[in-house]
Amino acid sequence: MRALGAVVTLLLWGQLFAVDLSNDAMDTADDSCPKPPEIENGYVEHLVRYRCQHYRLRTEGDGVYTLNSEKQWVNTAAGERLPECEAVCGKPKHPVDQVQRIIGGSLDAKGSFPWQAKMVSRHELITGATLISDQWLLTTAKNLFLNHSEDATSKDIAPTLKLYVGKMQPVEIEKVVIHPNRSVVDIGVIKLRQKVPVNERVMPICLPSKDYIAPGRMGYVSGWGRNANFRFTDRLKYVMLPVADQDSCMLHYEGSTVPEKEGSKSSVGVQPILNEHTFCAGMTKYQEDTCYGDAGSAFAIHDLEQDTWYAAGILSFDKSCSVAEYGVYVKVNSFLDWIQETMAKN
């Protein structure tokens, strides 16, 4: 029963430890584990195999360890070094499989967006964040600075945030890191105090190693933002949107290259940050769109060849709400080095 207890404990944290033991190895196990029968002119090896569930086995060998004469578990390639279970990304168990109709979007009842997190800032304002590993999330700098002064520091901001993953599971924030050029780069990362167990409802989305952005390319955006009645929804919603032509988007917003500001010449009254590190996504013919509170959510693109979902963008300008033609997203690929270096340093 001790072996069974190990399986249950590790499975709860997303890791499955499978053990195959026999003969002398059984002497160290519970009597309820039967010894395998012996065979003539042969022998039984004592082996253990490490496996992962919702995780990827990272090891120099094959994860199989043999009990040597010194009663040490060793692998032919890795020696005594144990393998690690690395969180799988971009592989939801129930991906969206059809064009369903975040204004009047569809409810996510299946857990198709396990990377979507809900962030609550000062004065209970709701925004989005995107899980990119089992301990890090991506969001916008504006989200992090909501209801904070311009001279607020990361240490000031972190304690004021509440974060939820999966089925509204609260997680503690250790620190936030904001891009040093946030006036034109609306991006920041959040480190959790502890790693979250990866499962069907909680799974990071993959970071892109290439640029997936091309006009007409379809992506999905999920979020907890305001609905058609301008009320924050208590159910996660999603919508499918096409990447828009950048020139058309810049013309729509008067080609702004500065942070959004009131009283601009834009037809919608505000100008988002638009530059070579951003892209736009337009509304579908059903008039579905993102709205206040959806910022920080991923523009998720499905790579059909790899059957993997990637965060091609992070929603920065979420105030279109079916009024403006386009939402604006930060290209994740443009800041991949900064994101990875920040996680490595911290």
From Swiss-Prot:
Protein role: As a result of hemolysis, hemoglobin is found to accumulate in the kidney and is secreted in the urine. Haptoglobin captures, and combines with free plasma hemoglobin to allow hepatic recycling of heme iron and to prevent kidney damage. Haptoglobin also acts as an antioxidant, has antibacterial activity and plays a role in modulating many aspects of the acute phase response. Hemoglobin/haptoglobin complexes are rapidly cleared by the macrophage CD163 scavenger receptor expressed on the surface of liver Kupfer cells through an endocytic lysosomal degradation pathway.
Any Pfam family hit: Trypsin
Transmembrane segments: none
Xref: SUPFAM superfamilies: Complement control module/SCR domain, Trypsin-like serine proteases
Glycosylated residues, chain numbering: 147, 181
UniProt subcellular location: Secreted
Domain Sushi per the UniProt entry, residue ranges: 31-87
UniProt subunit comment: Tetramer of two alpha and two beta chains; disulfide-linked. The hemoglobin/haptoglobin complex is composed of a haptoglobin dimer bound to two hemoglobin alpha-beta dimers. Interacts with CD163. Interacts with ERGIC3.
N-terminal signal peptide: 1-18
Superkingdom of the organism of origin: Eukaryota
Xref: SMART domains: Tryp_SPc
Domains as described in the record: The beta chain mediates most of the interactions with both subunits of hemoglobin, while the alpha chain forms the homodimeric interface.
Originating organism: Mesocricetus auratus
Entry's Gene Ontology BP terms: acute-phase response; defense response to bacterium; immune system process
Protein family according to the UniProt entry: Belongs to the peptidase S1 family.
Higher taxonomy: Eukaryota, Metazoa, Chordata, Craniata, Vertebrata
Tissue: Expressed by the liver and secreted in plasma.
InterPro entries: Haptoglobin (IPR008292), Peptidase_S1_PA (IPR009003), Peptidase_S1_PA_chymotrypsin (IPR043504), Sushi/SCR/CCP_sf (IPR035976), Sushi_SCR_CCP_dom (IPR000436), Trypsin_dom (IPR001254)
Disulfide bonds: 52-85, 89-206, 249-280, 291-321
Main localisation: secreted
CDD domains, alphabetized: CCP (cd00033), Tryp_SPc (cd00190)
Annotated Gene Ontology cellular component terms: blood microparticle
Stretches assigned to the Peptidase S1 domain: 102-344
Keywords per UniProt: Acute phase, Antibiotic, Antimicrobial, Antioxidant, Disulfide bond, Glycoprotein, Hemoglobin-binding, Immunity, Secreted, Serine protease homolog, Signal, Sushi
The protein's name: Haptoglobin
Region ranges (Interaction with CD163): 258-263
GO terms for MF: antioxidant activity; hemoglobin binding
